[in-house]
């Protein structure tokens, strides 16, 4: 454990609670001290749903520390079993309560005897995995549990559906634009004549998980949650899966072609015919998605000399890197992810589309990288938005973690062909504010002429005199911060603590 100012991926119990609260009629018991029980407030604020978050905190207090937790945890499980009548209760500790090293499996076994609900302990190592890994593992554990239960009851039907069908795995609460992406993916599959068999975990019942083997293939739109489940279903039941994220015109077409391949492997036998989705891909690419036209427009051509930095989860950061470089011609100076457990896949995806790759979960390292590169725009998480504000660099938010403004009520998918339009808008609008600020200054649109001094870490103690500040204010705002940082570095390098007009012009000559 470590004390941090900012975490890209939360602790493991948050991932378990995301999966539990995504299912319908599933309740989670969180064995935790006060301070770890913020999930309810966070989810209620961000998702803005009508229903209460189905999570109860079993608080570890001084009485628990003296007597032990067993009675309190078991009482909480049985009480929720009677009050809520859930199909499943998931017990999870937090990284803090795990220090107690209690036998929680024994608590679960005891509660299972007197509860009508199924009760399981989240099989997660809270010291070694983060939120995303825990969510992936918990979803696989729940699926494995109910398919095993159906097998023991001899109620597991493995016959596939009469028409092509798919399971969508990984849509969950608190995901980045997950609800919008699901609507777009649902429309995409319907256009292809594919029935949706199950969507897990969001909005599904655990009792319906025994129907998962009926699908022709599994669709995993995000690597972070769902991949372990898809691998398990392929190994255990022979169900193939598609894990190409349909973001951008090229990868959406690639995803559809993979779907076509898996459909045709079964269609030859089940339907005695094959499917051809190429006309659909052509129609959508040329006439529905505006991204291809936009990439050839003068607006997008003007962005080709610009530099960008991209940072986020592995799925969104890799997809955005390929879209900006391959489809829009924008130079990606650095592409990075905080998913250190998936660094090999991320490197493989982006190494041909960017100048350098950054794998870190330290926001200060990301900030210093952005300050060094001085890109025209950043595409990242909520933290990169803060970094951009400090450096006066525009930022488009393209990945979790995000704040409430990136849980829009309107329809804004990032996946599918409609998602390509949303991404094109986001990219273009992120590059524009620099010129807008310049024109506002040029025509005197603001009341103040003060120069905002912004730097990250290295130029502390450097003072600008009023005359040099006035001269700096004459530089267009979209270039001002970059030039100021270079002058600051020049002053520090040459041992100056106060910048005047003479030093300023000497630095500009050396630029």
From Swiss-Prot:
[4Fe-4S] cluster binds at residue 36. Substrate binds at residues 434-435. SUPFAM superfamilies: Helical backbone' metal receptor (SSF53807). It catalyses: chlorophyllide a + oxidized 2[4Fe-4S]-[ferredoxin] + 2 ADP + 2 phosphate = protochlorophyllide a + reduced 2[4Fe-4S]-[ferredoxin] + 2 ATP + 2 H2O. One of its GO terms (cellular component) is chloroplast. Its EC number is 1.3.7.7. It comes from the Eukaryota. It is found in: Plastid, Chloroplast. Its main location: plastid. Binds 1 [4Fe-4S] cluster per heterodimer. The cluster is bound at the heterodimer interface by residues from both subunits. Pathway: Porphyrin-containing compound metabolism; chlorophyll biosynthesis (light-independent). The active site is at 299 (proton donor). One of its GO terms (molecular function) is 4 iron, 4 sulfur cluster binding. It is an enzyme of class 1 (oxidoreductase). Protochlorophyllide reductase is composed of three subunits; ChlL, ChlN and ChlB. Forms a heterotetramer of two ChlB and two ChlN subunits. Component of the dark-operative protochlorophyllide reductase (DPOR) that uses Mg-ATP and reduced ferredoxin to reduce ring D of protochlorophyllide (Pchlide) to form chlorophyllide a (Chlide). This reaction is light-independent. The NB-protein (ChlN-ChlB) is the catalytic component of the complex. Belongs to the ChlB/BchB/BchZ family. This is Light-independent protochlorophyllide reductase subunit B. It comes from Huperzia lucidula (Shining clubmoss). The gene is chlB.
């Amino acid at each position: 454990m470590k004390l941090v100012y900012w975490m890209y991926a939360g602790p493991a119990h948050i991932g378990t609670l995301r999966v539990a609260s995504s299912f319908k009629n599933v309740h989670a018991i969180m064995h935790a001290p006060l301070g770890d029980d913020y999930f309810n407030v966070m989810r209620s604020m961000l998702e803005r749903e009508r229903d209460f978050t189905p999570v109860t905190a079993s608080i570890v207090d001084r009485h628990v520390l003296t007597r032990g937790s067993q009675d309190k945890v078991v009482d909480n499980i049985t009480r929720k079993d009677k009050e809520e009548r859930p199909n499943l209760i998931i017990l999870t500790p937090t990284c803090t309560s795990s220090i107690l090293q209690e036998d929680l499996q024994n608590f679960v076994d005891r509660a299972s005897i007197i509860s009508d609900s199924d009760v399981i302990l989240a099989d997660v190592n809270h010291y070694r995995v983060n939120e995303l890994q825990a969510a992936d593992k918990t979803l696989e554990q729940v699926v494995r549990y109910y398919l095993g239960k159906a097998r023991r009851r001899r109620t597991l039907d493995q016959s596939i559906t009469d028409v092509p069908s798919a399971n969508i795995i990984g849509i969950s609460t608190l995901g980045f634009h997950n609800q919008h992406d699901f609507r777009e993916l649902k429309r995409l599959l319907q256009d292809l004549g594919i029935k949706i068999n199950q969507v897990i975990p969001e909005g599904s019942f655990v009792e319906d998980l025994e129907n998962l083997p009926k699908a022709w293939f599994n669709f995993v739109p995000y690597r972070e949650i769902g991949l372990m489940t898809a691998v398990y279903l392929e190994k255990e039941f022979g169900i193939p899966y598609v894990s190409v994220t349909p973001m951008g015109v090229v990868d959406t077409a690639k995803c559809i072609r993979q779907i076509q391949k898996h459909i045709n492997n079964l269609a030859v036998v089940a339907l005695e015919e094959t499917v051809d989705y190429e006309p659909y891909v052509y129609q959508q690419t040329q006439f529905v998605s505006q991204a291809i036209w936009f990439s050839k427009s003068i607006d997008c051509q003007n962005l080709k000399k610009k530099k960008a930095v991209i940072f986020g989860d592995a799925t969104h950061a890799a997809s955005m890197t390929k879209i900006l470089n391959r489809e829009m011609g924008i130079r990606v100076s650095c592409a990075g992810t905080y998913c250190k457990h998936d660094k090999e896949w991320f490197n493989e995806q982006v190494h041909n589309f960017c100048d350098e790759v950054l794998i870190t979960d330290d926001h200060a390292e990301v900030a210093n990288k952005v300050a060094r590169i001085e890109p025209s725009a950043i595409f990242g998480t909520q933290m990169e938005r803060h970094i951009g504000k400090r450096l006066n660099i525009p930022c488009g938010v393209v990945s979790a973690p995000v704040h409430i403004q990136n849980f829009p009520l309107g329809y804004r998918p990032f996946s599918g062909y409609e998602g390509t339009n949303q991404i094109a808008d986001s990219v273009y609008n992120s590059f524009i504010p620099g010129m807008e600020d310049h024109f506002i200054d040029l025509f005197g649109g603001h009341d103040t002429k003060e120069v905002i001094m912004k730097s990250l870490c290295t130029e502390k103690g450097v003072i600008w005199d009023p005359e040099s500040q006035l001269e700096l204010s004459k530089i267009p705002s979209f270039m001002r911060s970059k030039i100021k940082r270079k002058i600051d570095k020049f002053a520090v390098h040459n041992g100056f603590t106060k910048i005047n007009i003479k030093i300023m012009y000497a630095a500009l000559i050396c630029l």
